[in-house]
Amino acid sequence: MGFLTAIGAGACSFSVLLGAAAQRMPTESRGVASGIINAGGSFGQFVFAPIIGKLIQWVGWMGSMWAMAVVTLLAIPLLNKLTSNTHAPVKPADPEGGLKKAVSDAMRNPSYLLLHLGFFTCGFHIAFLVTHLPTEVGLCGLSPTVASWSLALIGLANIVGSLFAGSCVNLYRSKYVLAVMYGSRAVLIALYLAAPKTEWTFYAFAVGLGLTWLATVPPTAALVGKLFGIRYLATLFGLTLLYHQIGGFLGAYLGGLVFEANNDYQWMWWADIALSAMAALINLPIKEGPIVKLQEA
């Protein structure tokens, strides 16, 4: 089930959606468009996190999975608009050498690799929290409902964060936007560790994190587009997203190992602070100017 879920998640991931949107939007609108796409995913998290939490209590996890499967199937008819080229005014030219050369050149680009490392940290952070936040809430003696609503608030706050990040892409250098986001995560986690563990602490923590949660996607995708153009944006951003998912695996898995060894997540929180600070610094040397400029017809 995990393997099939991963395939499905990859097939409708941000890289595919942002690549499709980039070829349908003028350059000045792509940042806002990516923010809207990202906000849509966050709205789904806000709506479904408490609903699924209740469904698990009522019908168990299997019944909840069936409910999510039905909702997912309802999205299939919407794909017709994405697979049609009739509304794609931007037609990027094929660079010499095609996809293979584009990927090869990208993987030798230091700025692209630095972007991967920063996004790796984002995945580590998000997967750790999504997987282990309910246990952390339980360790603090609070109801599981607090965890469900915290995840919902993360999704709600990320709608605002994603739209704001999409707008910032057109106003500021994307690498600075990312540096601020990653740095703010380190500060927020440090404040959480110092605060008393009440339900309102978790709610405030969730809102703060939600503002940067997946709001990193618009500036990250924008950087890939600035570096290499939009012709292979879906593929090149997909490779960046792969590092995000590797970080996610380690965040979830290592969180479990740390909990089994210590019965708390203290070491993971400090590791998360260190990685977030590192990600903020890693983005600063990125050369944001277009290195490969692909012509748009």
Give names to the regions the model predicted.
Residues 50-59, 137-138, 168-169, 254-263:
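Interfacial helix-cap and linker-helix signal at transmembrane-aqueous boundaries
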Residues 11-25, 215-228:
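Intracellular juxtamembrane helix-capping segments at the cytosolic ends
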Residues 109-163:
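Extracytoplasmic gate region of multi-pass secondary transporters
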Residues 81-101, 292-297:
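Flexible cytoplasmic inter-helical loops of multi-pass small-molecule transporters
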Residues 146, 154-158, 164, 169-223:
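C-terminal transmembrane helical hairpin of 12-TM major facilitator-type secondary transporters
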Residues 1-12, 120, 201-215:
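Hydrophobic core of transmembrane alpha-helices in multi-pass small-molecule transporters
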Residues 37-85:
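Helix-loop-helix hairpin linking two adjacent transmembrane segments in secondary transporters
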